[in-house]
Regions:
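Short, conserved loop-to-beta-strand elements that form functional interface hotspots
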Residues: 79-88, 94-124
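Structural signal for hydrophobic packing residues in well-ordered secondary-structure cores
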Residues: 32, 36, 65-72, 100, ...
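Short, structured patches in soluble enzyme cores that scaffold and shape functional sites
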Residues: 6, 115, 136-138
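A broad, structure-centric signal for solvent-exposed, well-ordered loop/edge residues
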Residues: 11, 16, 48, 113, ...
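RNase III-family endoribonuclease catalytic core
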Residues: 1-94
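Short, low-complexity, polar/charged sequence segments that are solvent-exposed and flexible
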Residues: 8, 21-23, 99-103, 130-134
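C-terminal edge-of-domain segments
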Residues: 124-142
């Protein structure tokens, strides 16, 4: 199964991971945690903990959103680069944006998604990997 940004993408390939392996939501979660100086996804949801085996990344991100909100943070903006040769991201951008916005309690206008390729170079170009980079901007309410 291939999940990108919480959306199941039709593909003969999938990702490996302790959870559902969604590289987009994992990167979003890590970026938000980093922006709030609250650690990382591996600290919060260890792959040694069986209760997180095969868990949907939408659930993990939802738990982090609750934690940051409880600590007075709000997401201002998410800028997301999805780097993959296949599948092409363009036709899934709106679905992914809406899914992430709903989980994060923000407007879809606060999320920007870009699909990139490596022009067939490296493991991503050979369709053996997917990468995702995310910059998260947060606001602390005092």
């Amino acid at each position: 199964k291939l999940y990108l940004g919480g959306i199941k993408i039709p593909s003969p390939l999938g990702t490996l991971g302790h959870s559902d392996g969604d590289p987009v939501l994992h990167a979003v979660t890590d970026a938000i945690l980093g922006a709030c100086s609250m650690g990382d996804i591996g600290e919060k949801f260890s792959d040694k903990n069986k209760k997180f085996k095969n868990i949907r990344s939408t659930i993990l991100l939802g738990k982090i959103i609750k934690q940051i909100e409880d600590n007075g943070y709000l997401i201002n903006n998410l800028d997301i680069n999805i780097i993959t040769q296949k599948p092409k991201i363009q036709k899934y951008k709106k679905l992914i944006t809406n899914c992430i916005a709903k989980i994060c309690n923000i407007s879809s206008s606060q999320i920007n998604i870009k699909g990139k390729t490596t022009e067939k170079l490296g493991v991503i170009g050979k369709e053996k990997a997917i990468a995702c980079e995310v910059v998260a901007s947060v606001i602390k309410n005092d």
